[in-house]
């Protein structure tokens, strides 16, 4: 008789534990336009803050998540690297140097808060380490 109560309770607990928190961060699809736009915004803002004369680009997306808040918060962990393109240049495509000594790779965490109905997007975290 007790197993009729215990088994369903375990099933519910297992389902809730594997579903993640409602409203918590979840994996973001890099093929989603909103995710790509948020990452591009983060890279542009990051480049505005660097003292380097060369543009930095994403070499690799390590992790991408999104969270429903009052809008959408995107959380990216990325490997960044230097490109041969100078800031203010006219180049449209700037790939990260293949040579690690030229690319000077480093890891960053970016958080972007997007509220499209207000035409508002903000960088809320721009933290990098060598």
Swiss-Prot record:
Q: Which UniProt keywords apply?
A: Disulfide bond, Protease inhibitor, Secreted, Signal, Thiol protease inhibitor
Q: What is the lineage of its organism?
A: Eukaryota, Metazoa, Chordata, Craniata, Vertebrata
Q: Which Gene3D superfamilies match?
A: 3.10.450.10
Report whether Transport shows up as a keyword of the record.
no
Name assigned to this protein: Cystatin
Name the Pfam families on file. Cystatin
Q: Where in the cell is it found?
A: Secreted
Range of residues in the leader sequence? 1-19
A single GO cellular-component term on record: cytoplasm
């Amino acid at each position: 008789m007790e197993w009729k109560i215990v088994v369903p309770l375990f099933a519910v607990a297992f389902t809730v534990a594997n579903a993640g928190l409602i409203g918590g961060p979840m994996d973001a699809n890099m093929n989603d336009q909103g995710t790509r736009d948020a990452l591009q915004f983060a890279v542009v803002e990051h480049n505005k803050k660097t003292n380097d004369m060369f543009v930095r680009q994403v070499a690799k997306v390590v992790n991408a998540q999104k969270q429903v808040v009052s809008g959408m918060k995107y959380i990216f962990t990325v490997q960044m690297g230097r490109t041969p393109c100078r800031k203010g240049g006219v180049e449209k495509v700037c790939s990260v140097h293949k040579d690690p000594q030229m690319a000077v790779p480093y890891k960053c965490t970016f958080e972007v808060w997007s509220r499209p109905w207000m035409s508002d997007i903000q960088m809320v975290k721009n933290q990098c380490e060598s």
